[in-house]
């Protein structure tokens, strides 16, 4: 069986069928966008943005084999890549950002009885991120990635219809490449002697019970025991002895979680949750640039695991025989052991090493309200979702100890979708999204002293990028089904009003009037901001 589609921006194809009748089957699917190909005629060699573009492709495959009535094997794989490139000859700048994931998994399902089920998995995953930038006689390449080897076993036991018990264990071996850099400035070339890597072991045991205590009250209680060990060499400064020493540490924690649902009546209920969580892998991001240069850093002796407490409570109501669903939910999350780059530190300054001098440690919180209205029945269906939230950070060594918004703080997030069945053959659809822009830190001035560039910044995350919003509309025509062939035609317009949503902002050095950029030697230089948009 084949299923596919050819569009103006992308194409897809899915193949599936039996390998051995009643024994095994397969599915293979792939996608590829070709925005980069379509944009080439509009970006000739005379265009300042020639060489810019974006595309992604992915491939998914899965094979399942029925060993017996109680045993099944599944082998699956995924490979995907996104590639973004930007060039502006007016500023003599070029940026390339390829990234993606690859995973392979082998899964065995076994049914012990009608009450006990087991799922065992072996998983390998590979994440790669690369950032390349070149301007005038300066070049920089940052590479980071994570390889994970994971094995886990999960059990599901259902003694009766009111009680479901889950328990299991998992282990992951991590290999980090948190940030390796190569570069060139004029005739000076920087090449590390070797690729810098870190290694760690992470394991967990868990148990949870989902039980209906009464017809009105349902409770889910769980407990997770987690452990983490950093097994690679890492150096930290001993400020008393004024020297760097190798140090490692093991972390072990208990993570409880509790959720409940209480039915007030057949159409309304209250839901609540409390969770504790330890995160052993940190996202180290810098707000000094809005480029996607975030790096993943493992916990160690000098970098403790991130800890969070989260509370949530919500009211849910269905109306008109479940035609409408409504919900309002509030949450509060408190976090400790967060990391941020110190003032003036960029990811490229800390690649090929892992000194604690690069990071500051602090706290944060996140809270908000989520609203949902959904229509499930009738010719016209859809939903409206809105989130009002705030996420802040507190660091003694950052922003003079004053509270500042997190890089990914999103004050407003709105989604509206609608689908209308015009007839048996025609379906109309639309999607509108709006989101507050990311917070970034702007450079106010740069000084060129002895060939080195020094930068002064505004307050941390004191500037908001423009909000992201767009409207998509579409129409799908499905002709009468033929004997062996089913087809449909989809007509859609992406970004109806041609909104230039920001992807990132970069800053170019602007020489004083009458001076060529490549001739800047000493003095003050004014950084000028440029916004880059993928679409339109």
Q: For each predicted feature, which ranges?
A:
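Flexible loop and strand-edge segments within Gram-negative outer membrane beta-barrel domains
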Residues: 70-148, 180, 186, 190-193, ...
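C-terminal beta-signal and adjacent terminal beta-strands/loops
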Residues: 425, 434-451, 468-470, 476-536
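Signature of Gram-negative outer-membrane beta-barrel scaffolds
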Residues: 168-269, 280, 398
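Transmembrane beta-barrel wall of Gram-negative outer-membrane proteins
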Residues: 7-32, 46-83, 99-118, 159-160
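Transmembrane beta-strands of outer-membrane beta-barrel pores
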Residues: 8-10, 19-21, 32-36, 79-83, ...
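Surface-exposed extracellular loop regions of Gram-negative outer-membrane beta-barrel proteins
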Residues: 128, 175-187, 229-238, 262, ...
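Outer membrane beta-barrel strand-and-loop segments of large Gram-negative receptors
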Residues: 148-152, 194, 202-204, 300-304, ...
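Gram-negative outer-membrane beta-barrel transporters
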Residues: 331-334, 353-442
């Amino acid at each position: 069986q084949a299923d596919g589609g050819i569009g103006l921006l992308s194409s897809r194809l899915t193949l599936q069928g039996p390998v051995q009748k009643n024994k095994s089957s397969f599915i293979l699917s792939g996608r590829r966008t070709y925005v980069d190909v379509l944009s080439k005629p509009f970006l000739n060699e005379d265009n300042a943005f020639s060489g810019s573009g974006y595309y992604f492709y992915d491939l998914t495959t899965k094979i399942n084999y029925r060993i017996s009535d109680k045993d099944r094997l599944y082998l699956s794989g995924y490979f995907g890549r996104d590639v973004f490139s930007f060039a502006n000859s007016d500023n003599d700048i070029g940026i390339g950002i390829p990234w993606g994931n690859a995973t392979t998994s082998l899964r065995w399902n076994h049914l012990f009885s009608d009450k006990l089920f087991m799922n065992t998995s072996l998983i390998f995953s590979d994440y790669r991120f690369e950032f390349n930038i070149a301007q005038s006689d300066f070049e920089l390449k940052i590479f980071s990635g994570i390889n994970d080897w994971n094995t886990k076993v999960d059990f599901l036991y259902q003694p009766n219809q009111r009680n479901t018990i889950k328990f299991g264990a998992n282990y992951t071996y991590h290999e980090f490449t948190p940030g390796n850099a190569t570069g060139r400035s004029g005739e000076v070339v920087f090449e590390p002697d070797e690729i810098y890597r870190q290694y760690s072991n992470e394991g967990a045991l868990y148990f949870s019970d989902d039980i209906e205590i009464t017809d009105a009250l349902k409770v889910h209680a769980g407990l997770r025991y987690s452990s983490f060990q950093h097994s690679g060499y890492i150096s930290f400064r001993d400020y008393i002895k004024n020297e760097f020493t190798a140090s490692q540490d093991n972390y072990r924690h208990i993570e409880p979680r509790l959720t409940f649902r209480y039915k007030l009546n057949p159409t309304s209920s209250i839901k609540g949750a409390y969770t504790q969580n330890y995160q052993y892998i940190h996202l180290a991001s810098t707000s000094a640039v809005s480029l996607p240069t975030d790096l993943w850093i493992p916990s160690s002796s000098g970098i403790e695991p991130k800890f969070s407490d989260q509370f949530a409570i919500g009211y849910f109501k269905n109306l008109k025989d479940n035609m409408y669903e409504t919900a309002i939910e509030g949450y509060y999350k408190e976090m400790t052991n967060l990391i941020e780059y110190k003032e003036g530190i960029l990811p490229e300054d800390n690649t090929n090493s892992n000194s604690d001098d690069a990071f500051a440690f602090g706290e944060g919180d996140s809270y908000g309200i989520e609203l949902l209205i959904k229509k499930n029945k009738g010719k016209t269906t859809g939903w409206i979702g809105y989130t009002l939230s705030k996420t802040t950070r507190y660091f003694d060594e950052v922003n003079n100890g004053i509270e500042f918004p997190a890089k990914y703080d999103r004050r407003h997030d709105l989604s509206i979708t609608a689908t209308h069945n015009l007839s048996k053959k025609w379906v109309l659809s639309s999607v509108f999204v709006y989101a507050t822009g990311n917070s970034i830190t702007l450079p106010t001035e740069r000084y060129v002293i002895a060939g080195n560039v020094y930068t002064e910044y505004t307050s941390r995350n004191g500037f908001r990028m423009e909000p992201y919003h767009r409207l998509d509309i579409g129409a799908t025509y499905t002709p009468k089904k033929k004997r062996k062939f089913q087809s449909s035609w989809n007509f859609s317009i992406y970004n109806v009003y041609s909104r230039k949503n920001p992807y990132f902002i970069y800053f170019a050095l602007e020489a004083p009037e009458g001076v060529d950029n490549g001739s800047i030697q000493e003095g003050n230089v004014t950084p000028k901001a440029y916004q880059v948009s993928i679409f339109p």
